Amino acid sequence: MTNTDKVQNVCGLKREDFQTRINGKETDLYILRNKDGNEVAITNYGGALVAIMVPDKHGNLANVIQGHDNIQDVVNSPEPYLSTLVGRYGNRIAKGKFQLHGKEYSLPINNGPNSLHGGKKGFNAKVWDALQMNDTTLVLNYVSAYGEEGFSGELKTTVIYTFTDDNELVIDYMAKTNKKTVINLTSHGFFSLAGIANPTPSIENLECEINADFYIPIDEVSIPTGEIRFVKGTPFDFRTPKTIGQDIDADHEQIKNGAGYDHCFVLNKREEGELSFAARIMEPVTGRTMEVYTTEPGVQLYTDNWADGYKGQHGASFPRRSGICFEAQHFPDSPNRPYFPSVVLNPGEQYKQKTIYKFGTIA
């Protein structure tokens, strides 16, 4: 039994609108609810977030995550990664090729000349096995077969969503393989702290802080150049809070290459793998805030630079730059960059990462 069976959901989503069978597996809607009645709604198709209901500074609840209100629209979304889980490899791998243990692997090309977010049918397009443990915890499991989307090894993946009484959405990722492989899991949440609407307001007035002294520059097809650059004196310096819109259209090579921000920031860490502060945004009209904490070495800032005007939950529309993504992850194209933190997973090892999105308000 899920929370959708017990009480009226403040998110307004209906369980039956998410129930169908895809490739022989059942999809459903799961509601996590904390002591204050705030909610997170998730479908097991792609592990997609379809509602995050949190209050503004006046206590008014609104949905701050972009998504869809039925399974057909989730499956057929013009933005296939709209607030979904991403794997096996989040972000880009140059030309869809990499070498591992002396063997070259070829992945589907689905983003210009590159492979993006695990290929043509990544974890965003899979039906996960779901078990709701209690009011606040959902466990998702997926077994990625050997050779799926060109990757080596069978990969057994578990993702646990927890919504705490402190309005923290905690995402724990775990995975094991039976053969050496590469892995880079993340969540592609499109956040709209003003609340989704028709149209959903621009993110350009969000005040943003990112705990990073360095970022990874990209070429014209969004592959890392190989450098790691200091943010000082560039549009990528968010060490002191500034609005997203201040430099999003700056006359800067890197902004042009990303059509805005679509870059990985190298997070400041005292030690590898520590859970630490990554980023914070504040929406000035509603007073809503979101802080990001992660064990990952990087966070991809994406400012919704391409898709424009498609429809979401309850008649909402999502113009270009109405959502913002903080994708906690290892760096893009790491399998081809031995000097980047390793993304190799060996048999007998366990991949683990934790990311927290903490929602709050300021007066």
List where the protein language model places each region.
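An exposed, glycine/acidic-rich loop-and-rim segment of catalytic or binding clefts
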Residues: T2-A363
